[in-house]
């Protein structure tokens, strides 16, 4: 069966700049934005340009750990 736009259920709340196409049946964009539909454990926010989703309330140590360069081996640190 070919993929049709709007057949996949949304996994995040609709926010400003989102299209109403593909919403789950019975869910309006205003209902999704009112906060009651949002998960209390993880909230998603859009950047000002509505280009990306951001997970709020994530400790900075998570981002710091994700951005660390891979550990160098002892041979690379002390070449002969």
Curated annotation (Swiss-Prot):
This protein's name: Protein FAM229B
Family the UniProt entry places it in: Belongs to the FAM229 family.
Source organism phylogeny: Eukaryota, Metazoa, Chordata, Craniata, Vertebrata
Positions of the UniProt region annotated as Disordered: 1-44
Membrane-crossing segments per the record: none
Pfam families associated with the record: UPF0731 (PF14982)
Signal sequence region: none
Coiled-coil ranges per UniProt: none
Domain of life: Eukaryota
InterPro entries: FAM229
């Amino acid at each position: 069966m070919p993929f049709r736009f709007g057949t996949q259920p949304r996994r995040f709340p609709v926010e400003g700049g989102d299209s109403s196409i593909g919403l789950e049946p019975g869910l309006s964009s205003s209902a999704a934005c009112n906060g009651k539909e949002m998960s209390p454990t993880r909230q998603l926010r859009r950047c000002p340009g509505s280009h990306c989703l951001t997970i709020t309330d994530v400790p900075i140590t998570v981002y710091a750990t994700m951005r660390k360069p891979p550990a160098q081996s002892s041979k690379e640190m002390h070449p002969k």
